[in-house]
Design a protein with these regions (language model features):
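Short beta-strand scaffold segments in enzyme catalytic cores
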Residues: 33-35, 122-129
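Proteins synthesized as precursors that undergo proteolytic processing into mature forms
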Residues: 1-117
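Intein/HINT protein-splicing elements and their conserved insertion hotspots or analogous self-processing inserts
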Residues: 117, 129-130
Length: 130
């Protein structure tokens, strides 16, 4: 026998899928530190924990900093969205802090919304000032 560690759960046994288990394939993995530059200079180094939340959380943190002008603390404190997609799930999980109008719009768009999920992962960041 052999072990695939927990990331092996990202494989599927359904044929003709991108993540179909096959010899030589690697499972989806999310060990992804992030680095943001500003005008070619180091600006922010950060990372998130949380398995499948990592790539989703990275995008949200970058948007909070770059697009919405938040500082590092605000970017980490802002509520996040987690899309559960493995094993046939299709659920949008929300951290507390989203206003009712945002939740209503997501539901109107047909999303299945869930609350109270604790695995959004931790966030750590180092920023360069000046």
């Amino acid at each position: 026998g052999f072990a695939l560690q927990s990331r092996g759960t990202g494989f599927t046994l359904e044929e003709d899928r991108v993540n179909t288990y096959a010899p030589g394939k690697r499972p989806f993995h999310t060990i992804i530190p992030a680095f943001i530059t500003r005008e070619g200079e180091p600006y922010v180094s950060f990372g998130l924990t949380g398995g499948g939340m990592q790539p989703q959380g990275h995008v949200q943190i970058v948007m909070n900093i770059v697009d919405f002008g938040m500082n590092l603390q605000e970017a980490g404190d802002a509520p996040r969205i987690r899309h559960e997609y493995l094993n046939g799930a299709d659920i949008v999980r929300l951290e507390s802090g989203f206003d009712y109008e945002t939740i209503r719009k997501l539901m109107t768009m047909g999303h299945t919304i869930a609350f109270g999920f604790e695995r959004f992962g931790g966030y750590q960041a180092i920023g360069v000032q000046g």
